[in-house]
């Protein structure tokens, strides 16, 4: 306490007690900061194949991945935002190749729909190694890397998955082999004498892999159960584009872009498989370049999207949340 004696009297100023301040802070923290454990779904399936959630280890493995998605907020929000732009590209390719729609969630487990590079050298949304990409028809060299071409890489992934399904006779094992490698998973199945993914003892990454896919699917389909209240307007919209067929060498890609009212940066953003300033093409291959339509890069182009009345994948109205 500080006491000041003046002519008019005595003035007393009370210095705040630090313990009181800390106590108030802790009280506010306890009142407002709460973490709830999300409930697991009663049933789950992948590509129409049932997940044995009655098995304790299976249930706890799914719980681990759902917790990861639930509390890695920025990563999961990115999943929702990117998926609204890229699922419309991926889904029809899966359908055309008779691959179950659930495999779009495999791309989330691989890269969260971003052009990632793994420590092992796998690249692109579908995370192909150089050798595997070439095996499934992708051009990979210093100037062109079609692992970054979402359409072609999705087609290549479909070819692999169909071959794996033909061999294993099971979509879940086919998905697991995408992570472990065909030979590695086949060896595990043969040595352990089981034909069910959920009965296999696997390396940690592959042991978690299917559960990560399942968790992505569950949270995508029931986001508000896990605390994600998102409006359609929160998502990245599909960008309006057109294509140009190129079957000759393009010596100067920055100039090619400029002639079309674009920058080299925009050309690369929409064609990340191009890795140089030129597009050599002595063999006269056909390349398809994707370019944005006029004004497609302006935020105002998408401002007329109809406002959401309810949250994504939920009947709860936005004005009813409390």
Q: Residue spans of the language-model regions?
A:
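An acidic, Gly/Ser/Thr/Pro-rich helix-cap/linker signature
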Residues: 1-98
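Second-shell loop/turn segments in exported
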Residues: 69, 73-80, 90-93, 113-123, ...
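Short, functionally critical alpha-helical segments immediately adjacent to catalytic or ligand/cofactor-binding
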Residues: 99-114, 174-180, 267-270
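Substrate-binding/active-site groove segments that recognize
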Residues: 121-142, 154-156, 161, 185-188
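Catalytic and binding regions of secreted/periplasmic enzymes and modules that target cell-wall glycans
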Residues: 161-188
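Primarily a LysM-type cell-wall glycan-binding module
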Residues: 231-261, 316-322
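LysM (lysin motif) carbohydrate-binding repeats in extracellular/periplasmic proteins that recognize
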Residues: 253-281
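Extracellular LysM carbohydrate-binding repeats and other cell-envelope/extracellular binding modules
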Residues: 270-308
């Amino acid at each position: 306490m500080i006491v000041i004696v003046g002519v008019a009297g005595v003035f007393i100023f009370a210095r705040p007690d630090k313990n009181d301040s800390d106590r108030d802070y802790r009280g506010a923290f306890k009142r407002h900061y709460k973490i709830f454990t999300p409930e697991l779904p009663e049933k789950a399936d992948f590509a129409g194949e049932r997940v044995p959630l009655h098995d304790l280890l299976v249930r706890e493995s799914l719980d681990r991945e759902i917790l990861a998605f639930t509390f890695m907020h920025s990563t999961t929000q990115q999943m929702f935002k990117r998926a609204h732009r890229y699922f419309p590209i991926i889904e029809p390719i899966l359908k055309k190749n008779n691959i179950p729609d659930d495999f779009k969630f495999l791309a989330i487990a691989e890269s969260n729909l971003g052009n990632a590079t793994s420590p092992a050298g796998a690249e692109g949304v579908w995370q192909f190694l150089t050798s595997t990409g070439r095996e499934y028809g992708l051009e990979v060299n210093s100037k062109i890397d079609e692992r970054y071409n979402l359409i072609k890489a999705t087609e290549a992934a479909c070819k692999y998955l169909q071959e794996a399904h033909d061999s294993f006779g099971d979509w879940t094992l086919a998905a697991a082999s995408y992570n472990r490698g065909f030979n590695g998973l086949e060896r595990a199945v043969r040595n352990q004498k089981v034909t069910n993914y959920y009965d296999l003892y696997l390396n940690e990454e592959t042991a978690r892999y299917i559960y990560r896919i399942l968790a992505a699917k569950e949270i995508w389909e029931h986001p508000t159960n896990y605390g994600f209240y998102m409006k359609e307007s929160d998502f990245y919209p599909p960008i309006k584009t057109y294509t140009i067929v190129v079957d000759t060498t393009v010596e100067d890609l920055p100039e090619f872009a400029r002639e079309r009212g674009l920058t080299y940066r925009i050309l690369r953003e929409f064609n990340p498989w191009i890795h140089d300033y030129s597009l050599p093409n002595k063999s006269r291959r056909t390349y398809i370049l994707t370019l944005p339509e006029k004004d497609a890069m302006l935020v105002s182009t998408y401002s007329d999207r109809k406002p959401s009345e309810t949250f994504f994948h939920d009947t709860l109205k936005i004005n009813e949340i409390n």
